[in-house]
Amino acid sequence: MIEAARWIIWEASQLLGAPSASIHDLYMARGRGEVSGFTVPAVNLRTQVFDMAGAMCRAAASLDAGTIVFELARSEQEYTYQRPGEYITSVLAGCIGAGWRGPVFVQGDHYQFNAKKYAADPEAMTEEIRRACRLAMEAGYRNIDIDSSTLVDL
């Protein structure tokens, strides 16, 4: 039943012009100097995701802004008890409810390596990150921030 509801929201987002999308092409165009003059806010919605995503879309529309990244870090998934499927469904539903038209950028934020786990078993830690990425991509995320900064000794 839950999967059916998620599927309905996913399909509605596609049909209503608010699909989950990768921000890659926009960033590449920006790097080539083809677009400029704007910033891209990235917001981590930890609670009231449906309401907050809708509020972000309404605010963006009122400013004629077209790009927002909705993020949820792996650590936030744990303490907010939100899995990728729940998060993206709430974001997309909030965007649809706000009348948003345009790509919806949902990102798995700071999929971070644990230095102690990596030192003990690099392959197991790497597989943990791979698994987290697979779950997010299967849920519909199109952007993942893999953070290996913890493995560098400055």
Q: Positions of the model-derived regions?
A:
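A cross-domain feature marking catalytic cores of carbohydrate-active enzymes
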Residues: 72-74, 108-110, 146-148
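Conserved, mostly hydrophobic/aromatic
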Residues: 56, 109, 136
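Helix-rich catalytic cores of soluble enzyme domains
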Residues: 112-154
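Alpha/beta catalytic barrel-like cores
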Residues: 1-105, 115, 131, 141
